[in-house]
From Swiss-Prot:
Family statement drawn from the similarity comment of this UniProt entry: Belongs to the CinA family.
Designated name of the protein: CinA-like protein
UniProt source species: Shewanella sp. (strain MR-7)
Pfam families: CinA, MoCF_biosynth
CDD domains given in the database record: cinA (cd00885)
InterPro entries: CinA (IPR050101), CinA-like_C (IPR036653), CinA_C (IPR008136), Competence-induced_CinA (IPR008135), MoaB/Mog-like_dom_sf (IPR036425), MoaB/Mog_dom (IPR001453)
Database matches in HAMAP family: CinA_B
NCBIfam families: cinA_nterm (TIGR00200), molyb_syn (TIGR00177), PncC_domain (TIGR00199)
Length: 425
């Protein structure tokens, strides 16, 4: 079986100044193609460290994807380090120099002399085309491994992996030994609670379970390695879903917002949103997905009591009698949001995100959520543990999404979430 590794370069990645989303995307994409990464290494912009890691990992891997360090500045050292690791010189690749000159001409810019560095490759390198940028990809054989060099710019990396890297490894290696993955997204239960339900199950050989906590969700990953295990994966996944019941909110989706987006897109139904404590988070997460304009009619942030009254038509007496964070208020918010454009559904939130503003009766983490439909309104008050402001908002958004998801599936809209908090009418 091919052994695949990844080397991520850059001081900003190593020091935590930026989150390495390239590595996460690459690993996920490879898994979608049935290919598993065995190791990932991060190294800074130091020539001797890069040389050492290229030499050491090339003794163990069959293919190594190297990401970053192909730019025109002094801290871009990947090509130089690869040449030194193999005992070669850097030579100008005339084809890539012409590409650079043409690229700058097309963009009506004068090419800086520093960009010529991007055409300098190790002597034995095979150029890998990058039609969407100026960084030249290349691959070099060192010891047992092919090292495949890619730019750090995310969309350039993605293009090169899809168009160059995956076809190369499929042609070069026997990839019969496959890995498959199913992902179940849950809310409202902690890892230990989920594990207590799953771990008594007898799993077939080749199938393993992993957990990833990323509040407000916990993702359950079901890995299947080998043809027999892959064939059994749907049955095992179905059994786990049955055991977990209402805790599972999506399958093979990264977020609950993505699940809602897909369901609304396919249903032709419309949604409006009125947000107070979530401050536009529900709307923003849906707008992240292309095509959301086909179902999302409007998103209103009605933070003040005055805006709740004047924009959504909340009765001032409701606010006086029950307060902004209450079932009656949030129900009127949802009804008002739905009525504006006669949407099929409307979600509304009003709560105390903290860190201040709570009372003994309504502490920080108290959130009222409502879903208005053409036939009526569902509502609930959740009392979240005292956590960060962002987490209270994201948990509230997740519960709102799940209420809508359950309505779309004609399931019970109001359910108990163990770890999110207790509920009251």
């Amino acid at each position: 079986m091919m052994k695949l590794e990844m080397i991520c370069t850059g001081e900003e990645v190593l020091s935590g100044q930026i989150v390495d989303t390239n590595a996460a995307w690459f690993a996920s994409t490879m898994m979608e193609h049935g290919i598993e990464i065995q190791r990932r290494v991060t190294v800074g912009d130091r020539l001797e460290d890069l040389i050492a890691v290229f030499q050491e990992r090339s003794l163990h891997a069959d293919v190594i994807l190297v990401n970053g360090g192909l730019g025109p500045t002094s801290d871009d050292m990947s090509a130089e380090a690869m040449a030194k690791a193999k005992g070669e010189s850097l030579v100008e690749n005339r084809e890539w120099r012409q590409h650079l000159e043409d690229w700058f001409t097309r963009n009506n810019r004068e090419m800086p002399v520093s960009n010529l560095k991007q055409a300098m490759l190790p002597e034995s390198a095979v150029m890998v085309d990058n039609p969407v940028g100026t960084a030249c990809g290349f691959r070099v054989k060192l010891n047992r491994a092919w090292l495949f060099f890619t730019p750090g710019v995310p969309f350039e990396l993605k293009h090169m992996v899809k168009e160059q890297f995956i076809p190369f490894i499929r042609e070069e290696f026997d990839l019969d030994a496959k890995v498959a993955l199913k992902k179940l997204l849950t809310i409202g239960h902690g890892e230990s609670s989920l594990a207590d339900k799953i771990e008594p199950l007898e799993l077939p050989e080749g199938i393993t379970i992993g957990y990833r906590s990323s509040m407000p969700h916990i993702e359950i990953k079901i890995f299947a390695r080998g043809e027999k295990a892959i064939a059994l994966l749907p049955r095992v996944t179905g059994h786990i879903k049955m055991v977990l019941g209402t805790a599972v909110v999506a399958e093979d989706k990264a977020t609950l917002a993505e699940e809602i987006h897909a369901k609304l897109l396919n249903s032709g139904l419309t949604l409006s949103v009125a947000e107070s404590c979530t401050g536009g988070m529900i709307t923003s997460q849906l707008v992240d997905f292309p095509g959301s304009s086909s179902y999302l009619q409007h998103g209103l942030v009605t933070y003040s009591n005055e805006s709740k009254v004047r924009v959504l038509g909340v009765n001032p007496a409701t606010l006086d009698d029950h307060g902004a964070v209450s079932i009656p208020t949030v129900e009127e918010m949802a009804k008002g949001a739905r009525a504006i454009l006669d949407s099929d559904f409307a979600l509304a939130t009003s709560g105390i995100a903290g860190p201040d503003g709570g009372t003994e009766e309504k502490p920080v983490g108290t959130v009222a959520i409502a879903l208005a439909t053409r036939s009526g309104v569902y509502s609930q008050m959740i009392k979240l543990p005292r956590r960060s402001r962002d987490l209270v908002r994201s948990l509230s958004a997740a519960v709102a999404y799940d209420m809508l998801r359950r309505e779309l599936l004609t399931e019970a809209v109001i359910v108990d979430y163990q770890s999110i908090g207790r509920f009251s009418k």
